[in-house]
Amino acid sequence: MKYAGMPFGMWVLFAGSFQKQLTAVLGYDADTARAITKKAKPQYRQIIRRLPEFEKADRFKMNLVNSAMIGAFILSMPQRPEVDRLTDYYARSMMTAPMQWFCRKSGKSKFTAKDITAMKATAALKAADRNPYSWNMDFYEYTDGSGYEGRFTKCGICVLMKELGLYDLTPALCHLDYTMSEAGGVTDFVRQYTLASGGPYCDCGYKKKG
């Protein structure tokens, strides 16, 4: 994967927040936070370079790029964080003001015909059959009309985190689904299993609020 484009853009958008939250959540002093960030950047670029390019129709490239960034930061920390603290750190790092705006904007189109069509197309794509760093998903609309579920049987984040030796920390990344759903303001996120915790699949259920 080329660093120019989305990977570069994501670093520009989020690196400052990742650095700030090293102090706010994980308790590193400002100098250490700067040093971690400085070390993480080449690590991030190296991870990105090892990844294949995603197909044009694959909507999950950003998910993998984000996980490459958090992976690079973890590998650059002097001490490996616990899952619960990493969960808080990752959520706060990702939920910048522009990201919250993006979630609200996405929320406005949730459950529209266009959204449903896009979800069905993603399920049909089965991108992980050709790219192990992508996702395979089945799509289910709830029979009572209350929303829908994406059920993932292959997960690019799981593959990457295993390669980085960070698989036990993957649940911290999974939890961002709840945070983003809440920020969108129109759905209640429901989940029974995750692949990262040994489940048969990872279910992402979106129920209409109210």
Give the positions of each predicted feature.
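A short catalytic or substrate-binding loop motif that flags glycine-/basic-rich loops and adjacent residues
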Residues: 131, 197-198
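Short, hydrophobic/π-rich interface segment
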Residues: 138-196
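C-terminal edge-of-domain segments
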Residues: 198-208
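Charged/polar, low-hydrophobicity segments characteristic of intrinsically disordered regions
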Residues: 25-31, 54-57, 99-113, 190
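Short acidic-glycine loop/turn motifs at beta-strand connectors
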Residues: 143-144, 208-210
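N-terminal, charged low-complexity regulatory/assembly segments
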Residues: 1-77
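Amphipathic interaction/junction segments at domain boundaries or subunit interfaces
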Residues: 65-71, 75-164
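Short, well-structured alpha-helical interface segments that form or flank functional binding sites
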Residues: 68, 176, 199
